[in-house]
Amino acid sequence: MAVALPEVVEELLSEMAAAVRDSARIPDELLLSLEFVFGSSAIQALDLVDRESVTLISSPSGRRVYQVLGSSGKTYTCLASCHYCSCPAFSFSVLRKSDSLLCKHLLAIYLSQLLRNCQQLHVSDKQLTDLLMEDTRRIKGAAGTWTSKTEA
């Protein structure tokens, strides 16, 4: 079962995709709408797209993940199909506080898809598994570090 974005976001992204197909650009009014819905994350996501920071990693089995090089220089792994990002902002603002719909990395993925500005990397199934396992270990390590600091 796919996780759906709120209808207003789906509609906005659909209108933006249609504008890109028709004129190869996004009109200012749609960019203003994007900023209204996502706040400062919209500008930050567009900056990530402009810097070509989004990479789609795919394997022969059809598995797909995205990696986004964040503005801090860290790389975050994202699963667009279930709206997940490994960044701290996603965990805190999207999951815990529910005050954001998406983090800037996920928004950058959706924007790079519609602007056709996404890097492509094809890897073996084993390489993709290793990448995901490494990311999982990194997240667990960071969570363990965070937990031990808060318990002290």
UniProtKB/Swiss-Prot annotation:
SWIM-type zinc finger locations on the chain: 76-114
Gene Ontology process terms (BP): double-strand break repair via homologous recombination; protein stabilization
Any single Gene Ontology cellular-component annotation: nucleus
Any one Gene Ontology molecular-function term assigned to this protein's record: zinc ion binding
Keyword Cell inner membrane appears in the UniProt entry: no
PROSITE patterns for the chain: ZF_SWIM (PS50966)
Subcellular location, record wording: Nucleus
InterPro entries reported for this sequence: Znf_SWIM (IPR007527)
Keywords, ordered alphabetically: DNA damage, DNA recombination, DNA repair, Metal-binding, Nucleus, Zinc, Zinc-finger
Described purpose of this protein according to its UniProt entry: Involved in early stages of the homologous recombination repair (HRR) pathway of double-stranded DNA breaks arising during DNA replication or induced by DNA-damaging agents. Required for meiotic progression, hence for fertility.
Subunit description: Interacts with RAD51D and XRCC3; involved in homologous recombination repair. Interacts with SWSAP1; they form a functional complex involved in homologous recombination repair and stabilize each other.
Assigned protein family: Belongs to the SWS1 family.
Protein name: Zinc finger SWIM domain-containing protein 7
Organism: Mus musculus
Gene: Zswim7
